[in-house]
């Protein structure tokens, strides 16, 4: 948590957003989960680009959507919603109504689209369902098969992702070190590709 907090502070000071976000955090702290507020603040402190794009896509709700909305210049903007919007703790106030300005919004299921449309009814015309391209049933079936390699006993953690600095694997290494120092029998498996 300290490393994340330190990163948030540095980024917000670099982009001059610290004092603006401090008041935002203070005003919204009672009605919004802290992790949601931190994503709003992190998006305001993130790197900015002078490039104008034809299309900008926020592939996940929260900080990604806030960043694309507030800090990316693009002719068209699209957003994906992967979660039950209300259950996940998002609100229009937290979003600062950013989804109203997106040109297209894609939900990953009919249920997800329905919940989102309940919060943003005026976005109904630009809201579509775009199912995940992953065959979840095939994954469930493969999970039942015996492992090809023997796995360590104890707590097994699996991380799947692109191995780049932006993904923050360096932070995860510190977390793993803390678990090992506390004598937890933890084994961390990483699947991915990239420069790290």
Where are these regions (language model features)?
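Nucleotide-sugar donor phosphate/pyrophosphate-binding loop at the beta->alpha transition
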Residues: 35-45, 65, 82-101
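A short beta-strand/loop micro-motif in the catalytic core of glycosyltransferases
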Residues: 57, 101-110
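Glycosyltransferase donor-sugar binding loop
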Residues: 134, 160, 187-196
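A conserved mid-protein helix/loop that constitutes part of the nucleotide-sugar donor-binding site
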Residues: 155, 159-178, 195-196
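Nucleotide-sugar donor-binding and catalytic loop/hinge architecture
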Residues: 141-156, 180-181
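An amphipathic, basic-hydrophobic alpha-helix
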Residues: 6, 17-52, 93
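Carbohydrate-associated surface elements
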Residues: 111, 133
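Active-site proximal beta-strand in glycosyltransferases
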Residues: 55-61, 66-85
């Amino acid at each position: 948590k300290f490393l994340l907090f330190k990163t948030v502070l540095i980024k917000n000071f670099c982009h001059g957003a610290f004092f603006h976000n401090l008041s935002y955090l203070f005003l919204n702290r009672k009605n919004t989960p802290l992790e949601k507020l931190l994503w709003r603040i992190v998006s305001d402190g993130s790197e900015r680009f002078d490039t104008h794009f034809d299309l900008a896509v926020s592939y996940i709700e929260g900080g990604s959507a806030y960043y694309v909305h507030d800090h990316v210049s693009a002719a068209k903007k699209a957003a994906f919603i992967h979660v039950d919007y209300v259950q996940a703790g998002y609100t229009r106030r937290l979003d600062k109504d950013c989804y109203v300005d997106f040109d297209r919004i894609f939900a990953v299921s009919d249920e997800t689209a329905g919940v989102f449309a309940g919060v943003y009814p005026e976005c109904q015309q630009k809201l579509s369902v775009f199912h995940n391209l992953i065959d979840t049933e095939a994954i469930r079936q493969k999970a039942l098969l015996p492992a090809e390699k023997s796995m360590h006993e104890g707590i097994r953690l699996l991380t799947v992702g692109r191995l780049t600095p932006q993904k923050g694997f360096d932070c995860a290494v510190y977390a793993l070190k803390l678990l090992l120092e506390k004598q937890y029998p933890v084994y961390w498996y990483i699947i991915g590709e990239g420069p790290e």
